[in-house]
A protein has these predicted regions:
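A glycine/serine/threonine-rich, flexible loop-to-helix segment
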Residues: 80-82, 177, 189-211, 249
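Canonical Rossmann dinucleotide-binding motif of NAD(H)/NADP(H)-dependent dehydrogenases/reductases
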Residues: 1-12
């Protein structure tokens, strides 16, 4: 909702759950206007992705901000040895591919969809390389994770979040030709249903002692960091929003 006060016309909320409509309704009530537009669908579906951009563009003009935040976890040890048989069981390749599709490929292609449309609009106007005398044409913020530095039991999740760092670094170099910025925020353990599902006893024992703040990060603190990266044109690269996390040895 902070974006509503910064001149943003509208925000497309994309999720597979029915709850996306309720979230949009709550944001609109807070903003006092029809600000959030819900879209229910699979972020890995190319046709759905294009339809979201088409719909928002028709209603509110070209998309210039992109925060592809969908993510899943399928956590298991990379290799586990059966105590009875002595046989090693390695992490499921199908699960790995699923996490990569949702957490890495989908975010990159949502960003590229926006950049491609901005590039087409500029080409149609006879514009080529963006110059500092112009306004910034767009901003991308990927949602990384402290797990990008490695985390036990998260071979697939950590790989995708590290992959976003490489994707962002490449997009930063390429997309500025079209006037588009790109960055990554790396949230720490945040007070969300996914983290609470670990059990608060586990959180108290295995997470909080390794944060400087000694508490879970509030979702609005992550939102503030995203808004900061979106709206401050001098900011690029990576921003760690981790409550002073230091991983245990």
């Amino acid at each position: 909702s902070a974006l509503a006060t910064k001149g943003v016309k509208a925000v497309a909320l994309v999720d597979m759950s029915d709850g996306v409509a309720e979230v949009a309704e709550a944001l609109n009530a807070r903003a006092g206007r029809a600000f959030a537009v819900p879209f229910k669908g699979n972020v890995t579906d190319e046709t759905f992705r294009a339809s979201v951009f088409d719909s928002i563009s028709r209603q509110h003009g070209p998309v210039s901000l992109c925060v592809p935040a969908a993510g899943i976890t399928r956590d298991e040890l990379a290799v586990r040895v059966d105590k009875v048989t002595g046989k090693a069981r390695i992490y499921s390749q199908d699960l790995f591919k699923l996490v990569v599709d949702v957490n890495l490929i989908a975010p990159v292609y949502w960003a590229l969809e926006m950049i491609g449309r901005i590039a087409e609009d500029r080409a149609a106007k006879g514009l080529k390389r963006w110059t500092p005398g112009e306004t910034v044409q767009g901003s991308v913020v990927f949602i990384g994770s402290i797990s990008s530095q490695g985390n036990r039991g998260q071979i697939s999740y950590a790989s995708t979040k590290a992959g976003l760092e490489g994707a962002a670094a490449t997009i930063m170099q390429e997309a500025i030709f079209h006037g588009v910025r790109c960055g990554v925020i790396h949230p720490g353990f945040t007070d969300t249903p996914m983290v609470r599902a670990m059990g608060m006893d586990y959180v108290a024992k295995n997470i909080l002692p390794f944060t400087q703040l000694g508490r879970l990060i509030r979702p609005e603190e992550i939102a503030d960091a995203i808004c900061f990266m979106l709206t401050n044109s001098a900011v690029s690269g990576e921003l760690w929003v981790d409550a002073g996390w230091h991983a245990p040895a």
